[in-house]
């Protein structure tokens, strides 16, 4: 990413996140994530994150632990305030948290609330230029972050480089649509909403912002990655979203699958 675009993205991202009420002064707020948002500002969103995490913890990680042993070496890409890395560390794994956002409340510097109790490495870097050796990780986890990539092919090429043989990439809480047209409509709606609320569309990074079925098929072929789709249960209200959208003649809503991409060969 060009330095000017990166700086604009980070400045606008910090504004959005602060206005949304993310982060806190108290360590207790961080230690409760993802199960409770003690501020109440984004309680519904953290409910979704908690269900995704529980599914990963109970249904996906144990299988890889049986295959590779504990600790699993896991890259947490787009780590934000590092809550996923902390949860992974408490399970006995060896995470590395990576992000370009270093804010003290919502970025990498918020890791101090965790590393004082459970140390793990924190790295300021981009998805497409990971400063780690080939074959470093058993797993790469994108927690609500894969869609910030500006080029999925470039990002996955770097992910494949740092994965060990039989490693896997896990994509959580990234919006998935049936078609790219549905995803593009969402992006345009988000830009208009941000322009109205914050005064800018927040598109300096040119993030893709969504996945669709055709793109998943193309990434499978290009990178020899076999995707398994996991569908956590997010409750009846979430389940009813497609029907509600159809009745109101709105675009189809996104799906929040957990995608596990295992490297073949």
Question: PLM features: residue spans?
Answer:
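Short alpha-helix
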Residues: 205-223
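Class I SAM-dependent methyltransferase SAM/SAH-binding core
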Residues: 81-129
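A short acidic, Gly/Pro-enriched loop at the edge of an enzyme's catalytic core
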Residues: 128-140
